[in-house]
Amino acid sequence: MEINDLLLDGLENLQRMIQKGTGGLTPAELKWQPRPDAESIGLLFFHIVRVEDMATHDIQGKKPLWVAEQWYQKLNMPADAGMGHLTPAQIAAFELPKEWQTYAAAVRNSTVNYLKGLKSKDFDRDVVVPPPPGQPAKPAGSAPPPPLPFTPTVGGILIHMLTALSARGGKIDYIRGRQGHG
């Protein structure tokens, strides 16, 4: 099995987990929070897709589809939606847009096409990780940023992405269970 096939299989498993976790839920259940400062299933699903979009396009040196294809406008949301730390009020107010699945499908299609084109040597390529949206780059001569929680290579970023998305998928299952859905 090639590395990209392993990642594609992991993303397919994650997609099944998310479909099971979000399937059949009402808008109120997607918005339900186990605590006032906890993310809802809808917000977790939102983050999963946005993180995949950013990570896979950052390593290609491209803008995420969210910006490049103006999904933020299509979904009537700010360009920086879902980035950074949200206040409890922002978390409580979040509602997953009705057309979210269309954006999620576009992101996954883009990811699959990118991964299918990678060769084993491509995973070792170093990547300059841009600062998070809304955070300026460090000026020359300033203290170095804290170490990244992953190796800044194509492979390191993709593995970190898959791990982070899987953790959010587990949270979705937990919240679904808290609402009485198996």
Locations of regions flagged by a protein language model:
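N-terminal export signals and maturation junctions of secreted/periplasmic proteins
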Residues: 1-8
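Helix N-terminus capping/helix-initiation residues
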Residues: 2, 86-87, 152-153
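Short, contiguous alpha-helical
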Residues: 8-12, 19, 29-83, 112, ...
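A structural signal for long alpha-helical coiled-coils and helix-turn connectors
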Residues: 22, 26, 116-119, 176
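Short, charged N-terminal helix-start/capping segments
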Residues: 27-39, 87-98
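Acidic/histidine-rich alpha-helical segments that form the ligand environment
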Residues: 78-125, 156-161
